[in-house]
Swiss-Prot record:
<comment type="function">
    <text>Catalyzes the phosphorylation of pantothenate (Pan), the first step in CoA biosynthesis.</text>
</comment>
<keyword id="KW-0630">Potassium</keyword>
<feature type="binding site">
    <location>
        <begin position="6"/>
        <end position="13"/>
    </location>
    <ligand>
        <name>ATP</name>
    </ligand>
</feature>
<dbReference type="GO" id="GO:0005737">
    <property type="term" value="C:cytoplasm"/>
</dbReference>
<dbReference type="Pfam" id="PF03309">
    <property type="entry name" value="Pan_kinase"/>
</dbReference>
<keyword id="KW-0963">Cytoplasm</keyword>
<feature type="binding site">
    <location>
        <position position="133"/>
    </location>
    <ligand>
        <name>ATP</name>
    </ligand>
</feature>
<dbReference type="GO" id="GO:0046872">
    <property type="term" value="F:metal ion binding"/>
</dbReference>
<keyword id="KW-0173">Coenzyme A biosynthesis</keyword>
<dbReference type="InterPro" id="IPR004619">
    <property type="entry name" value="Type_III_PanK"/>
</dbReference>
<keyword id="KW-0808">Transferase</keyword>
<feature type="binding site">
    <location>
        <position position="130"/>
    </location>
    <ligand>
        <name>K(+)</name>
    </ligand>
</feature>
<feature type="binding site">
    <location>
        <position position="188"/>
    </location>
    <ligand>
        <name>substrate</name>
    </ligand>
</feature>
<keyword id="KW-0479">Metal-binding</keyword>
<dbReference type="GO" id="GO:0015937">
    <property type="term" value="P:coenzyme A biosynthetic process"/>
</dbReference>
<dbReference type="GO" id="GO:0004594">
    <property type="term" value="F:pantothenate kinase activity"/>
</dbReference>
<feature type="binding site">
    <location>
        <begin position="108"/>
        <end position="111"/>
    </location>
    <ligand>
        <name>substrate</name>
    </ligand>
</feature>
Length: 260
């Protein structure tokens, strides 16, 4: 079985695969100071609770956008699973697609993995939207080439900036406005919900419309990340909502290495 490790700026997701099927997954907050032993206590207990013997893991693949977290996760793989981990984007785990951008080496692992998975699962011209700490918009053409994209502040970052800079504004949850259907709020909290949520939807729809116009061909939109389902319920701009896209991309990469 494959243990895929997706290290984001906010969370780390561990997923256990049999082939391309996710058998289980576990999530922990990203903290580069966490030791290999601390990861092991947490992860091995969860695996055992669900009936998985660590010996079933034959391959570990790590994708990270937090370089400082890589060392201790590699030690975890070696010390507790007896495996040298594969690292996404490093030999022998090459991306296998053309990156038609100014600095291909600067492409984040998460975005590259998303591009691989999206092309495999949804053939054609694509825009991949990933709601994370930042919200990224990536263009993948019908040949699977990465053509560039957009990086925007994530909605939580936007809300944090608003609340931290305006002393009298309260902290609110990230959710669709429920107390009013109007976009003209009559109290502070409603106005904030409308501004944060519908403002983000408008930004997202506007950017996608501009990207589609520039691509010049019909492009399907694939949404992933923690808030994809929430936004997918309030816009028709998405063709697919796929919260497992990044993990599936890791399984595809691991499969390629096995075939080699």
């Amino acid at each position: 079985m494959l243990l895929a490790v997706d290290v984001g700026n906010t969370n780390i997701v561990f997923a256990l695969f049999e082939g391309r099927e996710i058998k289980s997954r576990w999530r922990v907050a990203t903290d580069p100071r966490r030791t290999a032993d601390e990861y092991a206590v947490w992860l091995l207990q969860l695996m055992q609770l669900q009936g998985f013997d660590p010996k079933v893991v034959k391959q570990i693949l790590i994708s990270t956008v937090v370089p400082r977290a890589l060392h201790n996760l590699s030690v975890l793989a070696q010390k507790y699973f007896g495996l040298d981990p594969l690292i996404a984007g490093q030999p022998p785990v090459e991306w296998g697609f053309e990156a038609d951008v100014d600095e291909p080496r600067s492409l984040g692992a998460d975005r590259a993995v998303n591009a691989i998975a999206a092309h495999a699962k949804y053939p054609g011209d694509l825009i991949v939207v990933d709601f994370g700490t930042a919200t990224t918009f990536d263009v993948v053409d019908f040949n699977g080439a990465y053509k560039g994209g957009i990086i925007a502040p994530g909605i939580n970052l936007s809300l944090d900036a608003l609340v931290n800079a305006a002393a009298k504004l309260p902290r609110i949850a990230i959710e669709a406005p429920t107390r009013t259907k109007s976009v003209i709020g009559r109290n502070t909290e409603d106005q904030m919900h409308i501004g944060v949520f519908w403002g983000y939807v408008a930004m997202m729809e506007g950017l996608i419309a501009r990207m589609r116009a520039e691509i010049g061909r019909p492009a399907k939109v694939v949404a992933t990340g923690g808030l994809a389902v929430l936004f997918g319920d309030h816009t028709d701009i998405f063709d697919h909502v796929d919260t497992d896209l990044t993990l599936d991309g890791l399984a595809i990469l691991a499969e390629r290495v096995t075939v080699q």
